[in-house]
């Protein structure tokens, strides 16, 4: 399936369904294993509170840094793992906030950057991303849209 981004560019997208938090984590791990992410990529996670953004991140980080313990960076704003930075933008309200946490400095490095609550910073950001939209169907099931705008 293809969708159009805001600038009218057609991007590749796929829809997946998971039936548990563990399946969401495994799904992300398998995407990484299938080379869907590489150094320098920006992964834009979108979804409501409790949708599974951190579970997705756990799977992705488990592939790149298997010994890491992944937690949500809600209060720290960023957690760093081997070759992966995990930002939580829930409390970010302005471009000045992004500057104060050194966010833009990290874009020039070769880490994979995972951004929870990407919609909060989309207006300050024009990089191409791998977009992951996670929607809660019920308590356990999730609909995940993988959209790649890098090409």
State the predicted function of each range:
Residues 2, 6, 14, 62, ...:
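Short phosphate-coordinating micro-motif centered on Lys-Gly-acidic
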Residues 8-30:
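N-terminal pre-Walker A segment at the start of P-loop NTPase domains
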Residues 33-39:
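Phosphate-binding P-loop
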Residues 42-44:
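Short hydrophobic/aromatic beta-strand immediately N-terminal to the Walker A/P-loop
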Residues 46-48:
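P-loop (Walker A) phosphate-binding loop of NTP-binding proteins
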Residues 53:
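Conserved lysine of the Walker
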Residues 66-81:
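Short beta-strand-centered segment that lines the nucleotide-binding/catalytic pocket of NTP-utilizing
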Residues 80-106:
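Mid-chain, well-packed structural core segment of small domains
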């Amino acid at each position: 399936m293809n969708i159009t981004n805001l600038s009218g560019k057609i991007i590749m997208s796929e829809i997946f369904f998971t039936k548990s938090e563990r399946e969401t984590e495994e799904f992300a791990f398998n995407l990484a294993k299938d080379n869907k992410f590489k150094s320098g990529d920006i992964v834009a996670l979108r979804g409501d509170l409790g949708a599974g953004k951190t579970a997705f991140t756990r799977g992705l980080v488990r592939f790149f840094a298997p010994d890491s313990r992944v937690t949500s960076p809600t209060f720290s704003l960023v957690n760093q793992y081997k070759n992966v930075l995990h930002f939580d933008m829930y409390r970010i309200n302005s471009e000045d906030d992004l500057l104060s946490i050194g966010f833009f400095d990290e874009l020039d490095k070769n880490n994979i950057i995972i951004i929870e609550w990407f919609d909060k910073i989309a207006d300050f950001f024009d990089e191409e991303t791998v977009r992951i939209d996670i929607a809660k169907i019920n308590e356990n099931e999730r609909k995940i849209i993988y959209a790649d705008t890098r090409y």
